Amino acid sequence: MNDDLQRKGTVTVAISLTVNVFLAGLKLIVGFTCFSQALVADGIHSLVDIAGDVAALIGLRLAHLPKDEDHPYGHHRFSTLAALLISSLVLLFCLGLAWQSLSGLVSGEVVKKPELAAAWVAGAALVIKEIFYQFARRQAERLGSRLLMANAADHRADAIASFLALVAVVVAHFYPEWVAVDKVVGLVLAGWLGAEGIRLFKG
């Protein structure tokens, strides 16, 4: 990867990191204050995205280093390892989310009706992440970077997660008898994102 490609890749991931930090804080704060477990789960996923972005930045930096005695074939494998780390983090998130959702459904705990403010946040996150998916995917194709493609796929996963959170909040708010949909959405998110993580892990 030459200097120009490395710089463009780094800028792409740096922008992604900034957005994820903002969205993680917003989702978690609104999710907790507005009683939306689905949005909280989406916020936790954004925290995982932050770790993934940091790993991607490290991977891009190390992959750019020249060959040396310890790495006669260059450092490009660090980029691949960073991509694998992203997918591994997604899988860990899915396991935690599945456990939380299942335990909530089994215990039958009372869940408060989420407020509509959570729906607005989920909707905004959906639009933002889909825009970033399209941007990151084009950059990945242009630069021929597997790491950036993994990062782009994570943006798409985020967009779908936010969409499901949006649906869960709206349904639970207007139909209180279906308030448990928050936990069902948690299971759906865990399954879908788990499959995505496995796909990225296999490359």
Give a label for each model feature.
Residues 1-203:
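Alpha-helical transmembrane cores and adjacent cytosolic helix/loop segments
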